[in-house]
């Protein structure tokens, strides 16, 4: 497992979600619906909705499905009532896990999530028990192999001028960190410069990470996979770093 960056959990999640394409459609539709309900149906006036639509288009969700989800969120079409909550706890190795949930039955979902935690070497905590370990950030990756001849200094100047907080060289890619409100501007600046990106999203990044390896790492990844597969789990965040 050598060579993973401290944000390996994000890459792991993306690869896992790619293998769950059918569930991704449902989860992205829910995100669009809730974003539209909370902030209105105009993506230009609703950054969360704009980001959700962008992710849906990247996943090749048909535009009519996107529009239907927006209309369900604004109340123009009948829809199930989903509540957004966060559940949190610790996994194997003392790794903090934060789950973004959308559910129509909080009691049912809480019981199922608690069962997964306890069955796989973790424990579900109280609200706020691990959320403080994470902070909301814009996160963009720039694969070097997709951008031959890329110049780190030029990218650094570009993203900082657009409002980014940091640029990291992680070997096979650059990682750009932004405040949530600067994310769209930085993303647009990269797109306008024809710089290809891989991951571009607003996420929850850990302030500190916990090293895990061997059997402990396998148990942790198994638990994270089970959370990803749960119908009510929208996002999985964890503060681990894979080491030898």
Curated annotation (Swiss-Prot):
It comes from the Bacteria. GO terms for cellular component: cytosol. Keywords: Cytoplasm, DNA-binding, Transcription, Transcription regulation. GO terms for biological process: regulation of DNA-templated transcription. GO terms for molecular function: DNA binding. Its main location: cytoplasm. The keyword Transmembrane helix does not apply. Disulfide bonds: none annotated. It is found in: Cytoplasm. Belongs to the TACO1 family. This is Probable transcriptional regulatory protein CHY_1525.
């Amino acid at each position: 497992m050598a060579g993973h960056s401290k944000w390996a959990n994000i890459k792991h999640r993306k690869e896992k979600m790619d293998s769950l394409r059918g569930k991704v459609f449902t989860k992205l539709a829910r995100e669009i619906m809730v974003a539209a309900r909370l902030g209105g149906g105009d993506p230009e006036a609703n950054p969360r909705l704009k980001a959700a639509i962008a992710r849906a288009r990247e996943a090749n969700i048909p535009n009519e499905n996107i529009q239907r989800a927006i209309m369900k969120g604004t109340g123009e079409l009948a829809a199930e009532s989903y509540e957004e909550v966060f559940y949190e706890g610790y996994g194997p190795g003392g790794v903090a896990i934060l789950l973004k949930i959308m559910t129509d039955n909080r009691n049912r979902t809480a019981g199922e999530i608690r069962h997964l935690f306890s069955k796989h070497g973790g424990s579900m905590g109280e609200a706020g028990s691990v959320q403080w370990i994470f902070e909301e950030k814009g996160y963009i990756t720039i694969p070097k192999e997709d951008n031959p001849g890329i110049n780190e200094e030029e990218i650094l100047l570009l993203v900082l001028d657009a409002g980014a907080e940091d640029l990291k060289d992680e070997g096979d890619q650059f990682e750009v960190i932004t405040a949530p409100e600067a994310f769209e501007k930085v993303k647009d600046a990269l797109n306008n410069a024809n710089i290809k990106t891989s991951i571009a999203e607003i996420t929850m990044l850990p302030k500190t990470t916990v090293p895990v390896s061997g059997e402990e790492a396998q148990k942790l990844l198994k638990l994270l996979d089970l959370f990803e597969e749960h119908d009510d789990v929208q996002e999985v965040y964890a503060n681990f770093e894979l080491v030898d």
